[in-house]
Amino acid sequence: MGGSAIISGNVFAANGYSGAEAVNIKAGVKADIAGNIMFSPNTNGLKLSSSGQSETRGQAIANAYNNTIINAGWRRDGEKGGCVYVEKNCLANVVNNLMVNCKFRAMTPNYKNPNASDAGFDDKSVIDYNMYVSGTQKSPIVYPEESNVAYSYEGYNYKHKSYNPAVDTHSVIAAKDNLVNPGFVNFDINAVGLTEYGYNPTWDFHLSSGSPALSATSAKVIPCFENGLEVNGKLYKSPSLKPYFGAFGTK
């Protein structure tokens, strides 16, 4: 069970009503996830899990790089995730992604009990060298009994129990006094509501000249399918890792 996948060049918009992700993988899957726009997923842009791993169903392996994730997590009824969620022995490399107005940073629940298909992630994973940016909008949905997070920058800097101190140590993380604007060609990070889910096809997530997102460095990532994945006699190759944050560089 499981499968092999190259997930690239897509626009995911408004995934899920009361839960759900843009991309959700489980045990037995080997995937390269790159160059995608993920707008307003209900919970996470990426849920990478090896749930269901067994003697007959192998470990989930994922490379997620150069994706742009916007407004993740705000529409969920209650709080669980809100950006990237890596769990249950998944081996994941998550680098050079651009997170825009998401509710939280990358999470690795149960990280103190790693390498277990019923607990934490594979601790050989690299989840780092990403950029988290925030606008000034306040969410109309706030859970005072949980995090009480109302702004993206609050979520990024919240003391969450699933924030692993070994994750995002080299990432750019917006703060209240330094929100960081990636300078998209046509998307105002201060204007689109955090719970908005209607995707506007005129938006352009290419980066303007001088954007701080144009200079990214990361650990080397070798895509699972850099030499190709054959489907119905046709060979598809995964994109290479690009030296910027997000799905697109300049035009």
Language-model regions, residue ranges each:
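Extracellular beta-rich repeat passengers
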Residues: 1-204, 208-220, 224-251
